[in-house]
Amino acid sequence: MLKRLFVLLFLLIKFSSSFSQDTVLVTSYNLLRFDGDTDRNIHFKKVINELSADIYITQELSNSEGVSNFLNNILNQNNENRYLSAEFFDENDIDQALFYDKNKFELLSTSSIPGDPRPILLYRLRHINTEKVFFIFNMHLKASSGSSNETRRANQINQLIDYTQQMNTDHYYIAAGDFNIYSTDEPAYRKFFEQTSTGFGKFNDIVDAEGKYNNPIYAEIHTQSPRTSQFGGGASGGLDDRFDFILFSDSLFFGNRTFFIKDSYSVLGNDGNHYNQAINTMPNSVVSQELADALHDASDHLPVSAKIIF
């Protein structure tokens, strides 16, 4: 009888562990031409301490020195040694990079999908506890308004969908980064959600918005610019654009066991009351003056985050 109880207990523990869940925080953040210079590190440290994300999908790294600086002096500050970086492709003036919690993920591969003005970076990660493979497409699309720039953005999304339509419902993936999209009417934005020839590969946006993002009714989703004055090469003009995105595969949007938490999508520091204002204009109802100043001085973008259950 006692032996049978031990066997039953073992099976219950094994069953429970096989269905254990892990909540992962994913953040996309444009770092504004970040390099080996440490002048802005103090500001980024405050932002990162507040976020404490498991994965950072970043844009505008100027060089490999910038990757090392962000990894060693900001993410792994005080010799924490929690994060690793993916292989860095130094191909343009500014490039994308990925940083991840080595205790939660193993990097399987890094590759690029050719694009204009820069490639899409694809990272394949394995979630250690569940062994599920997670695909991240890190993108920094062509900036500026105008039909020619819209066409270049749309062409790059076509290249992305050519890849993702080869996937199926067993693939978990997101597209994140600085999309530089001004409106839901843009061809690039619409292409994310069109049905493909295979029936797979489209994306989902948790944000419910229609038309131009430069509108006070969408103030709470704006990510650029947290500044009204121009300095350090960044954009000014106050918060009035949604340029930074995280989009989700059907498997994450409608998943039962692996999915993202819909009410977790957030723009750090944006309380919805700073349309065309600097993020550190007080009052700010969601962050302190110190953190608002750090967000203001670190970059001309605000970080976007979401939680995913594995």
Residue map of PLM features:
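Sec-dependent N-terminal signal peptides
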Residues: 4-14
